[in-house]
Amino acid sequence: MHLSDFDFDLPETLIATRPARPRSSARLLVAEARGPFRDRRVTDLVDELQPGDRLVLNNTKVIPARLFGTRHRDSAQGPVSAKVEITLLEPASEGWTALAKPLRKLAEGEEIVFSDALRATVAERGADRVRLVFNCTGDDFDAALAQAGAMPLPPYIAAKRAADAQDRDDYQTVFAARKGAVAAPTASLHFDEALLAALRARGVEFSFVTLHVGAGTFLPVKVDDVTTHKMHSEWGEISDQAAAEILATRADGRRVIPVGTTALRLIETAAAQPGGFGPWEGDTDIFIYPGFEFRITDGLMTNFHLPKSTLMMLVSALMGAERIREIYAHAIAQEYRFFSYGDSSLLLPDRGA
């Protein structure tokens, strides 16, 4: 299985840099295992889903993890300073691990100033990341980060424009509750309160799980034999309540449809445990590619993914590689918008396939 098997040509003009407004007005490509595609809108989920279907939603909350600061050091010529860009990754036992640009010019013990209220000391510098210890913690840190930080937009958007105040709303789901992600669960960005209410009225049910999406979601696959790729790890949790709801839906023969690849990866991680699906908490590095046996997933709502990405491999595993090529060819021909701020799809494989 080669990396090139998951490649395709995407016109640059189809990469979305802003979301649809309102967010639920984005387009929705509905694709079953065979047969014609349906070109709909996200609001049409009310018609496409059935009473009793259960959507599994990721309630992680994106933190403003991108920081721009100034490092200061003394030199033979006197005090010197330089600009530094930091992307927080995850809390460490003390401080935070982070990506830094330029990494090689940072020295352990140096201070980086981000604002009057927020500064950090470089506690460790590794080969590809640093550990920073900030001058404040807890609520004080959250408040200072909210003031100084920017939303960590994906590289393909950040290359075109800087994050702004609008992204604070746009790059956050309406049901975000648990802080810790440095990337949004983007399929869920399409939901607004009106759509959630309409789906409830239709008889669609919801379960909330948490997977803190990490920056590793944007890392490229660097091996040709994709089966040798080492997946990044992310923390997730399925509560007792969510597990019970999902199990009850399955027991009744109804559909479990995760919204987004993060929710899918989390519930399939739990389903692969020796005792079967149930409450779960921990770090998952599950890698889903063609040949994977889905145990709990009956469908998936997901945006359109990058060529040669692990997420292209995931949707190929769900629908079959040939069917996904047909779906993506249709999406490109019909000028669907791609990636995090783009349009969405509802993928419905044969049940039990």
UniProtKB/Swiss-Prot annotation:
Pathway of action: tRNA modification; tRNA-queuosine biosynthesis
Class of enzymatic activity (EC top level): transferase
Gene Ontology CC annotation, any one: cytoplasm
Gene3D superfamilies the record matches: QueA-like
EC number: 2.4.99.17
Location of this chain's protein in the cell: Cytoplasm
GO biological process assignments: queuosine biosynthetic process; tRNA wobble guanine modification
Superkingdom, taxonomy of origin: Bacteria
UniProt keyword annotation of Transmembrane present: no
Classification via Pfam families: Queuosine_synth (PF02547)
Main location: cytoplasm
Tagged with keyword Cytoplasm: yes
PANTHER family xrefs: S-ADENOSYLMETHIONINE:TRNA RIBOSYLTRANSFERASE-ISOMERASE
Main function: Transfers and isomerizes the ribose moiety from AdoMet to the 7-aminomethyl group of 7-deazaguanine (preQ1-tRNA) to give epoxyqueuosine (oQ-tRNA).
Protein name: S-adenosylmethionine:tRNA ribosyltransferase-isomerase
Gene: queA
